[in-house]
Amino acid sequence: MTSISAKLRFLILIIIDSFIVTFSVFLGYAILEPYFKGYSIDLLVLSSVILLVSHHIFAYVFNLYHRAWEYASVSELMSVLKAVTSSIVVTLLLVSLLISESPFLRLYFITWMMHLLLIGGSRLFWRVYRRYFIDNAVEKKATLVVGAGQGGSVLIREMLRSQDMRMQPVLAVDDDKNKQKMTITERVKVQGYVEDIPELVKKFRIKKIIIAIPTLSQKRLNEINKICNIEGVELFKMPNIEDVLSGELEVNNLKKVEVEDLLGRDPVELDMALISRELTNKTILVTGAGGSIGSEICRQVSKFDPQKIILLGHGENSIYSIHQELSKTYGNRIEFVPVIADVQNKTRILEVMNEFKPYAVYHAAAHKHVPLMEYNPHEAIRNNILGTKNVAESAKEGEVSKFVMISTDKAVNPSNVMGATKRIAEMVIQSLNEDNSKTSFVAVRFGNVLGSRGSVIPLFKNQIESGGPVTVTHPEMTRYFMTIPEASRLVLQAGALAQGGEVFVLDMGKPVKIVDLAKNLIRLSGKKEEDIGIEFSGIRPGEKLYEELLNKNEIHPQQVYEKIYRGKVDHYIKTEVDLIVEDLINNFSKEKLLKIANR
C-alpha cells in the first residue's frame, strides 16, 4: 500500500480538524442551550471563528500535522492537550476583549472537552486502524537498527510509518552507554551494544540489520557483517543524515552493504590547503578521463575549484558521459573541455598542451587488462609506454608544473605484459625528471581498485546473477584492493607532495584472498555458496599468486603522509630509455620486455 503524500495528509488533517473544532462549539451550544438565554448568536459565531484560527496556529506550533499518528504515544497526546488547551485559552481571552458580554465559561469547558476528545480520538483511531488492519495485511521483517542518534531515530520512525519499506523496527543498539535503555518510540528502545547483536538476533528473530551510523569504523562494519554472515541476516546502510535533511535523498533510500563497503577503509584526512594550492584556479589535464580512475580523479579535482579541467580520452562515449556529469554538478563555476585524442599521437597531444597550457597533468590513460594484453602486446607497448612517453614529453615541452602518472602494483617484478609496460613507463618519466626541468614527474603506484571496469568484482557479480559457478584462478591467490575514491584522493595528495622523480606507493592495507572475496559476494547477493559454487580454473598467462608494492631496489620506503610512501628509485638516462622504447616497438619479444622491466 502506497503511503499518502505529505501534502495530501496535511490537507486532510486540516479539513478534519476544522470540522471537529466547529462541531465542538455547536455541540457545546446544543448541550447548554437551556442555559444560553441572554447571550447573542454573535458570541457563538465569534467563538467558532477565533477557535478555528487559533487551533490551526497551535496545531502547527505543536507539530500536530507532521507527526506519525499511526504510532502515537503519550508524548504525541500531550502535544494534542497543549494545542487544544492553548487554543481554548486564547479564544476565551480574545472573546472577553472583543465583546461586552462576559463569556459563558461552561460553553468553553464543554467545547474544550469535546475538542480534546475528538482531536485525540481521531489520531488514535488512525493508529488502531493502521496497526490492526493495514500493518497486519503487510508482512514486515523484524529489523535491528545500529545507531540511536538522529539518523537512527529518523529511520525508525520512517519504517514505522512506511508500508513500502516492509521492515518492522524491533530494537536498536548503540555503543554509547548514555543511550542504553533510551526510548526512541513507544515500540522501539535501545537494548544493548554492537557486541550484543548475535544474542539479540536470536532472541528477537531479526531478519535485517541497518547501519545508521555514517561514521561507523571499517572494523566495526566488518564485525557486524561477520555476524550477519553467521546468522543469515541481510545488512543495509542508510543514507547520510545530512543528505536526508537537505532533501537530496529519502531516508528510506537504503543500500545493501556491498563488498566495496567491507574492503574500504576509514578515510584519510587530506592536506586540503596543500592540494588547494596545486589545483584551485588552475587548468588541469586528465588523460583517460572517461575511465574508472580518470573519471574519479576528475570528480575529486572538481571539489577544489580549478579554473578548467581538460577531459582527454580516446573513447567518445565515456568522455561525453563524464563531461555531462561534471558540467551538471560543477558547470556553474568550472569550465570542462572534452578532448578526443589518442595518446599514441604525439602531434595531437602536443597541440592540446600548447592550446590549454595546463598547470598539472594526471596521466590515467592505459591498457590495464592483464590477460587481454598477453594477446595484444604490441598495443600494450604503444599505449602504455609510447603513449606515456608522448604525454610526458609534451608536458615537458609545454612547461607543465606537475606530471602525475597512475601506475600499478603489477609494475613490481612484473610477470606479464601489462605490468612490464607500466614499469617501463615509470622508467620513462623518471628519465625525464632532470635538474633543469620545469616539470616535476612522479608516479603513483597502487593495487586493484574496487568496481573498476574489467576488475574481478563485476565479473563475479555477473557470474552470480547467471547462477554460477564463480570462477577463481587459485585458492591461494591474493590481491590488494582499494576503493576508486580513496585511490583518487591519495593520488591528489601524492601529486601535491611531489618534488620530482619519486615513485609513491599507496598503502593498500592487507591483501585479500580472492576466494574469500567470492564467498562474500555470494552471501551479499542473498545466495548460498552451495547453490552458486566456486570453481578453480588455474592461473592465467601472466598472473601471479600475489602482488608486491615495491621491488628489491625500492625497499625501505619512507612514509611521507598517512598511507603514502616514497620508494627509493634509481635515475634513468633519457637517451638510454629512448633507445629501449624504440627497440621494443620495432623488435618486440616478451622475453626482452620482461627482462628490461625486471632489471
Swiss-Prot record:
GO biological process terms on file: capsule polysaccharide biosynthetic process
One GO CC term on file: plasma membrane
Keyword Cell membrane: yes
Topological type in the membrane: Multi-pass membrane protein
Domain of life: Bacteria
Segments traversing the membrane: 12-32, 41-61, 79-99, 102-122
Keyword annotations of the record: Capsule biogenesis/degradation, Cell membrane, Exopolysaccharide synthesis, Membrane, Transmembrane, Transmembrane helix
Pathway recorded for this protein: Capsule biogenesis; capsule polysaccharide biosynthesis
Pfam families (UniProt xref): CoA_binding_3 (PF13727), Polysacc_synt_2 (PF02719)
Keyword Membrane annotated: yes
Record localization: Cell membrane
Protein family membership: Belongs to the polysaccharide synthase family.
Function: Required for the biosynthesis of type 1 capsular polysaccharide.
Official protein name in the record: Capsular polysaccharide biosynthesis protein CapD
Taxonomic lineage from the root: Bacteria, Bacillati, Bacillota, Bacilli, Bacillales
